[in-house]
Amino acid sequence: MTTKPVLGISGCLTGSAVRFDGGHKRMGFVMDELAQWVSFKLVCPEMAIGLPTPRPALRLIQTVSGETRMRFSHAPHDDVTQKMVDFAAGYLPKIGDLAGFIVCAKSPSCGMERVRLYDENGNRGRKEGVGLFTAALLETWPWLPVEEDGRLHDPILRENFVERIFALHALNTLRANGLTRHALLDFHSRYKLQLLAHHQAGYREIGPFVASLHQWDDLDAFFVVYREKLMAILKKPASRKNHTNVLMHIQGYFRNQLNNRQRGELRDVILHYRNGLLPILAPLTLLKHYLAEYPDPYLMTQNYFDPYPDDLALRLAVT
């Protein structure tokens, strides 16, 4: 398996001129920053079904019976729904263990949410839909991190997506190297604090499931369920409250090493973060400093401190 996470991506977001108007929607963050740390598998579903660029615009039509169809806006009876469905059904199972997918917002083929729906007379309806290709993607791999370009401008959603793709890549790598009970338990142990920061109830629910590993004869079957549970927890953006609980938990590991001044400083930094006066990077940096000075075997394994490459600097923007 590649040492880099592999992401599927709508081709237009990489700068490829494949849009219906012959243009593109190149994403600066993805191509100028994230691209250093991941590999891409490009796809333009509309070109993949044989359409040229430029081409007439497509739209999603909701029929009287409630079915969603993909048709040309200028020729509403020219239907390409089945071509798109067939392409997705043939393409998705063959592209390997992706760590995530970035799709083009509002596209009738790739949009993840709020895609315009029209009635059969060409009038815009009240409801909104999902692009046909992305709908198939979400159905095929419900645990896969999927985001669209517009949402990735939000610092919290961006950080959450990147965190998830690196977690899934690590899990995929674990499986590729051969599953063992020890490896699965070690993986979960390294992600405990990270899971706690995302969803306390999910953290408490997944613990007993992992503890039941000895009852599973089929490790691959266990992996499939664990993957679904892990990614569901990480999909919930970590809250300031949950981060504070984790930071205070970590603080307790240094109670015997720090003097009164150091303990007070650390407590104040965590409280300032909790109250929105400092970004999460402030208490994390101080805790990492103390961890380097007073190594703890358990804390040193925790992925919470470095869930993705520091050079992406995503925590600078997360308050």
PLM features: what roles do these ranges have?
Residues 2-7:
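Extreme N-terminal starter segment of soluble prokaryotic enzymes
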Residues 45-67:
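Short, surface-exposed acidic-centric catalytic microdomains
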Residues 14-22:
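Short N-terminal binding/cap micro-motifs at the start of the first secondary-structure element
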Residues 67-87, 97, 123-190:
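Divalent-metal-activated hydrolytic enzyme cores
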Residues 23-41:
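Short catalytic helix/loop segments, enriched in acidic residues and glycine
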Residues 10-11, 44, 102-106:
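Short beta-strand segments
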Residues 146-319:
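Acidic, Ser/Pro/Thr-rich low-complexity regulatory regions
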Residues 87-119:
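N-terminal glycine-rich phosphate/adenylate-binding segment common to multiple enzyme folds
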